[in-house]
From Swiss-Prot:
Family of the protein in this entry: Belongs to the class I-like SAM-binding methyltransferase superfamily. RNA methyltransferase RlmE family. TRM7 subfamily.
Gene Ontology biological process terms in this record: cytoplasmic translation; neurogenesis; tRNA methylation; tRNA nucleoside ribose methylation; wobble position cytosine ribose methylation; wobble position guanine ribose methylation; wobble position ribose methylation
Subunit organization: Interacts with CG33172/WDR6.
Keywords: Cytoplasm, Methyltransferase, S-adenosyl-L-methionine, Transferase, tRNA processing
Catalytic activity: cytidine(32)/guanosine(34) in tRNA + 2 S-adenosyl-L-methionine = 2'-O-methylcytidine(32)/2'-O-methylguanosine(34) in tRNA + 2 S-adenosyl-L-homocysteine + 2 H(+)
Protein name: tRNA (guanosine(34)-2'-O)-methyltransferase
UniProt key word Iron: no
List of catalytic residues: 162 (proton acceptor)
Species: Drosophila melanogaster (Fruit fly)
Gene3D superfamilies to which the protein is assigned, alphabetical: Vaccinia Virus protein VP39
Length: 320
């Protein structure tokens, strides 16, 4: 399979390289902004799980670059991720864990004591191929993004995050409705129809009365215990609003390259592999396997044992 094969099969991958985006996922945020006008007039934005930086590019392109140089300093964009990424003009990078309160404090400090007007997150776990498990882990990641948003998002702010459509979608929707007046699930055309991926678009942020920001992955706020013992009564049915982007391009379709096509390399390769820490840890572990050696000759066995005292101890009672 040639290197142009993916350019044929994935029109958004091809366009991302031609237009200078680090990943095809940039079009997902662009289409969300086109549909809901999320970024108009904003000056403070947070990109969670930002690497390799395509959504941070979109934020910079829409909020930072259109302004004259003397006015750009008022726009503050911060990208948060445990992994490093190549610099983007107008974007501050913070290598930190989004589940830590200290990360929220660092973000607010970057904004000079103010809070963000929008929080976006395109983070996703490594896929296992088991859809139920993957959707569960993705839901926990979404709740982590929502948790830190309750610390850093200003009243009336917006929140956009990846979600996997599954049986937990209604529960996550219920969680979001506690904090946002307007919530829907959005499917951009840059997201393949064959994928369970979608995005929650939540607007008009408002903390409930008496609510104290906490970790939503460990605390429930829809009071499931109130249904315990009510065997004859079922929880209310939740209908989640769904919005699909109407575009001319289809991410599942193959497009001809055209006569003037010129192959382009990806805009920015990852600085480090996501699994680099695991490689470093396992490199210190001795996982060498010593095969079993069967010796039938008694003289050979004695010579072999004489070469290494540890072998005699290991064999012990096994040698007769």
């Amino acid at each position: 399979m040639g290197r142009t094969s993916k350019d044929k099969r994935d029109i958004f991958y091809r366009l991302a390289k031609e237009q200078g985006w680090r990943a095809r996922s940039a079009f997902k945020l662009l289409q969300a902004d086109e549909t809901f006008q999320l970024l108009e007039g904003l000056t403070r934005a947070v990109d969670l799980c930002a690497a390799p930086g395509s959504w941070s590019q979109v934020l910079a392109k829409r909020l930072y670059e259109p302004l004259p140089p003397e006015e750009r300093e008022k726009v503050k964009i911060i990208a948060v991720d445990l992994q490093g990424m190549a610099p983007i003009e107008g974007v501050k990078q913070l290598r930190a864990d989004i589940s830590k309160e200290s990360t929220a404090e660092a973000i607010i400090e970057f904004f000079g004591g103010e809070k963000a007007q929008i929080v976006v997150s395109d983070g996703a776990p490594d896929s296992t191929g088991m859809h139920d498990f993957d959707s569960y882990v993705q839901g926990e990641l979404l709740l982590s993004a929502l948790s830190i948003s309750t610390f850093i998002l200003e009243e009336g702010g917006s929140f956009v995050s990846k979600i996997y459509r599954a049986d937990r979608t209604s529960r996550l929707y219920t969680q979001l409705k506690r904090f946002f007046k307007n919530v829907c699930v959005f499917k951009p055309s840059a997201s393949r129809n064959s994928s369970i991926e979608a995005f929650v678009v939540a607007r008009e942020f408002c903390l409930p009365d008496g609510y104290k920001p906490c970790n939503l992955t460990t605390e429930w706020h829809d009071q499931p215990e109130s249904w315990v013992g009510r065997k004859k009564e079922s929880p209310p049915v939740v209908q989640v609003p769904f919005v699909a982007y109407k575009g001319e391009l289809d991410s599942d379709r193959t497009y001809d390259l055209g006569e003037n096509y010129v192959y382009k390399e990806p805009v920015q390769q990852p600085l480090t592999a996501a699994y680099q820490d695991i490689l470093q840890k396992t490199s210190q572990v001795n996982i060498k396997y010593e095969g079993i050696r069967v010796i039938h000759d008694e003289e050979m066995l004695k010579k072999w044992l004489e070469n290494d005292e540890n072998k005699s101890e290991k064999l012990g009672a096994c040698v007769t």
